[in-house]
Amino acid sequence: MSDNDELQQIAHLRREYTKGGLRRRDLPADPLTLFERWLSQACEAKLADPTAMVVATVDEHGQPYQRIVLLKHYDEKGMVFYTNLGSRKAHQIENNPRVSLLFPWHTLERQVMVIGKAERLSTLEVMKYFHSRPRDSQIGSWVSKQSSRISARGILESKFLELKQKFQQGEVPLPSFWGGFRVSLEQIEFWQGGEHRLHDRFLYQRENDAWKIDRLAP
């Protein structure tokens, strides 16, 4: 098959979205109520990694970057994830804290996008979560200088075994370079696939202490 034939095949890949619609009259006043309902349904549907979300940041040149992290907590203050503070994403957030999140629940023909500002979590919040993780995950946090170049996986594996021996007694200490961010909730868009590409999109925008809801064209 030529490259052109393959491209033509990709261009014709499509399907109808038939899982159901989303109507304005069914929307709660608070977007977190709908988010919680959708997240619960994603878990009940046994989606792989239902808390996985794409975090989009930009560097100092305006170049966007995306990666998948796991949502670890959410409330009216925002959505929380944890990371290595030496990572590319952490440096980009330090330079420009405006980010977007995306939950791609394809099987349910849904996605949720969040736009807001990322702020560092307190040491107390980070420490509480860090010590709730499996011990090997805690040790793993010490191993990698995230986003740095390495010559082989064996370097990481050797370092892990070395640190596992070092920390075999007592608690694993919290690395100074490990932390988390809370993304504020300024805008939340809910997308539900619809027949004939007439998808349902609703945008919640915070206005003072209330939420404004608008339907967007698909």
From Swiss-Prot:
Pathway: Cofactor metabolism; pyridoxal 5'-phosphate salvage; pyridoxal 5'-phosphate from pyridoxamine 5'-phosphate: step 1/1; Cofactor metabolism; pyridoxal 5'-phosphate salvage; pyridoxal 5'-phosphate from pyridoxine 5'-phosphate: step 1/1
Uppermost EC category: oxidoreductase
Chain residues that bind FMN: 67-72, 82-83, 88-89, 111, 146-147, 191, 201
Cofactor: how and how many bound: Binds 1 FMN per subunit.
Enzyme Commission number(s) of this protein: 1.4.3.5
Keyword entries, A-Z: Flavoprotein, FMN, Oxidoreductase, Pyridoxine biosynthesis
Organism domain of life: Bacteria
One Pfam family in the UniProt entry: PNP_phzG_C
Catalytic activity: pyridoxamine 5'-phosphate + O2 + H2O = pyridoxal 5'-phosphate + H2O2 + NH4(+); pyridoxine 5'-phosphate + O2 = pyridoxal 5'-phosphate + H2O2
GO MF annotation, one: pyridoxamine phosphate oxidase activity
Cofactor: FMN
InterPro entries tied to this protein: Pyridox_Oxase, Pyridox_Oxase_CS, Pyridox_Oxase_N, Pyridoxamine_oxidase_dimer_C, Split_barrel_FMN-bd
Alphabetized PROSITE patterns for the sequence: PYRIDOX_OXIDASE
Record: residues binding substrate: R14, R15, E16, Y17, K72, Y129, R133, S137, R197, L198, H199
Cystine pairings recorded for this chain: none
Gene3D superfamilies: Electron Transport, Fmn-binding Protein, Chain A (2.30.110.10)
UniProt family annotation: Belongs to the pyridoxamine 5'-phosphate oxidase family.
Function comment: Catalyzes the oxidation of either pyridoxine 5'-phosphate (PNP) or pyridoxamine 5'-phosphate (PMP) into pyridoxal 5'-phosphate (PLP).
Quaternary structure annotation from Swiss-Prot or TrEMBL: Homodimer.
Stated name of the protein: Pyridoxine/pyridoxamine 5'-phosphate oxidase
Organism: Escherichia coli O157:H7
Gene: pdxH
